[in-house]
Amino acid sequence: MQIQDNVFIVTGGASGLGAATARMLVAQGGKVVLADVQAEAGQALAAELNAVFVQCDVTSEADGQAVVAAATALGTLRGLINCAGVAPAMKTVGKDGPHPLELFQRTVNINLIGTFNMARLAADAMSKTAATDSGERGVIINTASVAAFDGQIGQAAYAASKAAVAGMTLPMARDLSRNAIRVMTIAPGIFETPMLMGMPEEVRTALGAMVPFPPRLGKPGEYAQLALAIIENTMLNGETIRLDGAIRMQPK
């Protein structure tokens, strides 16, 4: 799949992994629609990249449809990169009692259902496009986490939501094979996201030192590099790739 002159949607595109991916796509000649709840940051990045910003709650069907409509108005939609998500920390039973059910539901709703919502809507639009010379119509890249495999204390909701994203990768890829649309998932380790960058420097350094090699936090641009490789390599389909420097998370 070539990026040049094609249209790509990036959810969670206003910051972090999504913003790095949007920059990569534009650098490769792609047209980008940024979808995010953060209006101010999203509009600023869209202006910088000459992209389109649509304020979007990924759990909303109407918002998702508006994003896809904006993308198809730009040209031929060829890809969706799902980076929107939340990462709460709460024990199953803590000092204040049981894990709030609303928080668990919200986490699953955004991370899992929001991912599926955007994927199904984008896939429907891509399925109606003419195939490329290689026979491909599009690619969907979802974002899980190493927590899907090595969930830590306090990550029951987050790990469950991300494990489900990894779990639906293969069946979704099989579903969409008849439409010539690929589905891949990236499971990042500890990355320089806005949440982590708000921590004290000594904490960030200690977290980076936990990574076998390279012994540092991952950079958003490295996520974007993998997204680029997935987009360009048509044989990559139906798999979750850990991008984590060989880390295996300890219980806490």
Question: What does each of the following model-derived ranges do?
Answer:
Residues 39-40, 56-66, 101:
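The beta1-alpha1 cofactor-binding region of Rossmann-like NAD(H)/NADP(H)-dependent oxidoreductases
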Residues 87-105, 124, 128-134, 154-157, ...:
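Conserved mid-core segment of classical short-chain dehydrogenase/reductases
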Residues 124, 173-175:
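Alpha-helical segment proximal to the catalytic Tyr-Lys
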Residues 2-32:
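Canonical Rossmann dinucleotide-binding motif of NAD(H)/NADP(H)-dependent dehydrogenases/reductases
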